[in-house]
Amino acid sequence: MNQEAFSTADAQGYFSRMLRGETPPAPVLTLLGSRIDAVDAAAGSLSARYEAQANFRNPAGTVQGGMLSAMLDDLTASLVDATLAAGQAVATLSLNVSFLRPAQVGTLQGEARMLRRGRDVCHVSGTLLQNGKEVATAVAVCKIVSVPS
């Protein structure tokens, strides 16, 4: 798929196609080293891994908070995406991030949990862990939108 021509119509079913390996991940997911480990849409949970690269470091030598925020945005929106019907897509309305400790270059484990799923608005929590310790948490409010066919 030509990424420059990616449209909202392409979003329909994108998550499912990506999990099945039928379409490559979006460039931002490649940048973040995103890999979905497990999804349980019925239980409202998702596990993923991210690879923080050396070029994600801030002047202090730890992973820059904006990169962690991008990981949490992907994590929470992916859980909502896993629950969508045909003709729907997800858009993040807000993302409230708390940074708990510095993250180092390397693997981060992500865990997302659906707090509330309404007809068109979802509240989702996300946590990033490194070496079993919480690095950052977030609560996202996501909007379910109709995708023009």
Give the predicted meaning of each segment.
Residues M1-S149:
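Terminal targeting signals and extreme-terminal segments of soluble enzymes
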